[in-house]
């Protein structure tokens, strides 16, 4: 990936924060070294928080483990049910009965943060939403995510779906260490579905030197959540940021924390695994009034500002300096075996069905949108947008 060094580096006399100097931040934060697990900064790491679409990281992790166990393959069919199709945005908008490959479904879930596709993945891998949530919770217990509970695979609000910044750090380490082959999916700049370009909601990707992941999340009670990662000189740092007030501010905070981490001469001695619980660990914070009350609909969206004048004037993030690389995804091409959970329920294998018509959230006028070269809907093909 081509990067321009957007970051204005701190001067030699700048103060470098560490675990001994707490950041002046309002909400939960954990910054850590991926390889060692050493924590560079943390604040309210055990505070219960609504994960929103960060839940999709656990959905991905459960699915990666199902692939490793032989329950499903990357080219296995994921069928959109009536239930999954009815999930609210952010969504792809495919009709019930639509079928896609699992790998394409996961990319839509991670890049577009599509709630309908996350639910479809959960239903197909687990057999039902409830059964998949049980698997999510079982993995959380196994990993030691003691402040976490899930009821759905997409992160739509429920008072019973919660996590902590520390637990999310544990999950990130499990994903990146156990399944490095999927790491490129977390740094995809955008998707191409036919002629439609879908950008990644993660404003670090392509805008912050070394950025390579991972996920954003938003519901009104949670505020704007983000897990951002970056690698420089072989060192990967991760920032977990919860409860920011906008898509822009969460990216700016994550970038600032990552930059402070890379500038730190050494990491702290405390690791994610041994960090002892502290503070309030039982009550959940609800930001609904602060984030969504008296806000216009577009201000409640997961998506960042769409127009240039709304772009932040920040030393940490700027516009892309290159044409985004899009990964082509779509329906069809599912030639692999049906998921084990579906077969166990007596379902029949469905593969390579006719491609249904794509129903976007908002119809696109004919002749508009970027042209996409090499936009094959199957597998890991990438394409460049052309003006």
Predicted regions and their residues:
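Bacterial N-terminal signal peptides that target proteins for export
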Residues: 1-11
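Domain-terminus/edge residues, biased toward the C-terminal soluble/receptor-binding domains
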Residues: 146-149, 153, 157-162, 166-387
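Active-site-adjacent loops and short helices of periplasmic peptidoglycan-processing enzymes
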Residues: 2, 16-166, 173-176
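Short, positively charged
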Residues: 10-12, 34, 192, 208
């Amino acid at each position: 990936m081509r990067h321009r060094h957007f970051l204005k580096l701190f001067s030699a006399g700048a103060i470098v924060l560490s675990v001994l100097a707490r950041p002046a931040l309002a909400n939960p934060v954990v910054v850590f070294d991926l390889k060692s697990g050493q924590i560079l900064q943390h604040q309210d790491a055990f505070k219960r928080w609504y994960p929103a679409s960060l839940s999709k990281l656990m959905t991905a992790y459960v699915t990666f483990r199902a692939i490793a166990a032989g329950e499903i393959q990357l080219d296995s069919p994921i069928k959109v049910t009536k239930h999954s199709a009815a999930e609210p945005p952010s969504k792809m908008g495919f009709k019930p009965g639509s079928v896609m490959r699992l790998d394409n479904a996961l990319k839509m879930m991670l890049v577009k943060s599509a709630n309908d596709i996350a639910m479809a993945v959960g239903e197909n891998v687990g057999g039902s939403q409830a059964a998949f949530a049980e698997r999510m919770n079982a993995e959380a217990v196994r990993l030691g995510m003691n402040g976490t509970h899930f009821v759905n695979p997409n992160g739509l609000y429920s008072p019973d779906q919660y996590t902590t910044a520390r637990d999310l750090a544990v999950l990130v380490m499990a994903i990146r260490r156990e399944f490095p082959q999927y790491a490129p999916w977390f740094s995809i700049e955008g998707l191409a579905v036919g002629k439609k370009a879908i950008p990644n909601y993660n404003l670090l990707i392509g805008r912050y030197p070394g950025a390579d992941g991972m996920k954003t999340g938003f519901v009104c009670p949670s505020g704007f959540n983000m897990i951002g990662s970056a690698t420089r000189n072989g060192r990967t740092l991760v920032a977990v940021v919860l409860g920011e007030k906008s898509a822009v501010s969460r990216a700016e905070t994550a970038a600032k924390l990552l930059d402070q981490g890379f500038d730190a001469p050494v990491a702290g001695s405390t690791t994610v695994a041994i960090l002892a619980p502290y503070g309030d660990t039982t009550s959940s914070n609800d930001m609904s009034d602060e984030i969504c009350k008296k806000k216009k609909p577009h201000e409640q969206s997961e998506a960042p500002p769409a127009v240039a004048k709304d772009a932040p004037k920040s030393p940490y993030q700027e516009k892309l300096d290159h044409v985004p690389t899009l990964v082509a995804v779509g329906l069809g091409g599912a030639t692999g075996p049906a998921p084990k959970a579906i077969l166990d329920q007596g379902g029949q294998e469905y593969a390579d069905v006719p491609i249904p018509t794509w129903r976007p959230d908002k119809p696109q006028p004919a002749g508009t949108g970027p042209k996409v070269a090499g936009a094959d809907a199957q597998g890991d093909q990438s394409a460049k947008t052309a003006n």
